[in-house]
């Protein structure tokens, strides 16, 4: 993978000139000039997904210049490097192969000359056997009762992905009740334990090293709670499984290493739901549906790795994102799913994007002088419309938005879905085209009112429009289509990281806070006043000690 400063390319300079020509062009102008704009600026993924990017401040020339940037930054070479198992995570000397976890073609993928697919398939087979025993009731707890509840204990990628997917695919779930514990705040584990019975609960401890502070603190609290009821430590093996590679620590905890599900250092945490970390997904929706999830992602992997950049959906979305982030100065992107089951999707890609591309040092080790990853946020529609859409419509900040919705709902109650989708379509239209002063005044006339007497309020009812959006319409949210959608966003993030010349697959930014927390923890054990930090940190610690007594 090459290290190219994007701002030094000819394509970047051409884009800067083009931006000067485009900055005052409106989306309304673009549609007025081209009645065929939708067909030119939309694409489908099989019969599963339609991506409409026509309501953006772009022309065919814009996209051509952005494609030139991708070529100059050798995006095609970077894609080949990732899929071939090259160690593109150079700061940790690791390959990046979440694509191998869902490689349904079983084509060999090599790391250090060794095909990883046999090991991937062996773990999948183990997940299948284990999950079938739990779901069928064949697996019994220490009193002979079948498992009814599963508690996944993890944090970051070991929590966000499985939680998001099990919620998104709730229509496919079986009888098992799923719970997720991540926060080291004791309230999280305490509230979950109130809902479950030690005789019928299975805990999944998701930590590659089996040393993650938050996860192991929660796991030990769960173990203590369980043993208060079960008594004998030998029963731990019937109620705990590990998603880890540290067999020694897993065994010492009391977990049978036969129920330890491994993954590899070429699986990044925020890309790990496809691995053993996805065991909670398998237990929730069954192995066959999990395979469908993998198959959908694999289909998008094939699209990304083989489709020319001009028609490549992750590449197109990535380039449009760079256009706003690096030329228009937009600092955020909103992800707005119009489906309640998808309520954790934005939070999942908040980590997926911000932990991946929130970097200020480039691949050469130099501090960048251009913008890197955007701030990602969002909530499901229509809730967001009654919360933050005001700022998107009439605020002073540009917020490019992705609107996501299924054409077919899993819950066809009355006309709920038509009302939901009418809002989905209306919002992108309103954001693009707005509402002029003339229209506001005409509305007053139609109501029999004189606009002149209401002049003081007219400006507040004007919508400038020209707010960019992408619309992603799925036929239906299924395991397959969700897998494809997740992979679409993963590859968008990778593409942007390649072009921005940063390392997308490390996350050193999480380390400093952890180091300092480990230093501070012993200082909180007693009541002595602290003076070892800056005055602010000392003051906070000392007030905490005074108040806790």
Curated annotation (Swiss-Prot):
InterPro entries reported in the protein's UniProt record: G6P_Isomerase (IPR001672), G6P_Isomerase_C (IPR023096), Phosphoglucose_isomerase_CS (IPR018189), SIS_dom_sf (IPR046348), SIS_PGI_1 (IPR035476), SIS_PGI_2 (IPR035482)
EC code(s) of this entry: 5.3.1.9
Pfam families according to UniProt: PGI
Molecular-function annotations in GO: carbohydrate derivative binding; glucose-6-phosphate isomerase activity; monosaccharide binding
N6-acetyllysine: modified positions: 80, 228, 234
GO process annotations (BP): gluconeogenesis; glucose 6-phosphate metabolic process; glycolytic process
Active-site residues, record numbering mapped to chain: 355, 386, 514
Catalytic activity reported: alpha-D-glucose 6-phosphate = beta-D-fructose 6-phosphate
Domain of life, per lineage: Bacteria
Functional pathway: Carbohydrate biosynthesis; gluconeogenesis; Carbohydrate degradation; glycolysis; D-glyceraldehyde 3-phosphate and glycerone phosphate from D-glucose: step 2/4
Keyword vocabulary terms for this entry: Acetylation, Cytoplasm, Gluconeogenesis, Glycolysis, Isomerase
Subcellular localization(s) per the UniProt record: Cytoplasm
Top EC category: isomerase
Disulfide bonds: none
UniProt GO cellular component terms: cytosol
Assigned protein family: Belongs to the GPI family.
Function description: Catalyzes the reversible isomerization of glucose-6-phosphate to fructose-6-phosphate.
Protein name per Swiss-Prot or TrEMBL: Glucose-6-phosphate isomerase
Lineage start: Bacteria, Pseudomonadati, Pseudomonadota, Gammaproteobacteria, Enterobacterales
